[in-house]
């Protein structure tokens, strides 16, 4: 009984801290986020956290992006992994009858028809099983399913068997329908609970919120999240969070030195640049061309990467006196 209570409590803390990590994005200089919601009730699945964007936000492929929805799944131990078959098992998400993939299908049909417009994240400290078919089709760049790899192979291949099983499970007839359902999915491995606490402390300081004292047993943001939920306050803009922070004596403000520079960013690595769009006025995302350190095809350097970078940098010649260039890229891109 005690262990079950600990597991539930730690799961709530994990979700609350990831919520505050996203709340801090509201205070970025060039943020595209205008609202963050805890327990989003208008979406039955992926409702743990919702991040809503203003006009001009795009996904990794340049399509308009309205929101990111998160299902946060904490596990007390590392005694488990994510597999392609497990995603069809309701027990994987502690459900009785509806699987993770079925929830994805429902959410995609409601908020990302055609596979674009929203992204759906599974955020968990568990990793993908290295020996599973899923490991060979999930991008290390951004956690998406690499649809071309999944589509490769005939009915008797590993990919063909996975496609067939998923089609049957989701009650769809064609691979095209299946790939549309999977297109907005992102599988993201989160840190440990302690690592998330440490990362959040840095974000809180940058956002102008009071960090949690190191070694403290009480985490005020965990407790505040519970109290706000009980009061029915679950969705917040920047102004509303600032008001809550001042009321709870967790707001200290911050000053940002702004030199009038136009900030441009290029990203080919996801880690440490997850929200580069919040720090820049204009951003070029090249994640779709890479899987970790390696390009998906050597030809992409000449057909896509170089032309895109060249066009993007040509904007720097259009009359703006100062530029800040943020490069979270492979060294080969940085020297172009």
Task: For each feature predicted by the language model, list its residue ranges.
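Catalytic centers of nucleases
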Residues: 4-87
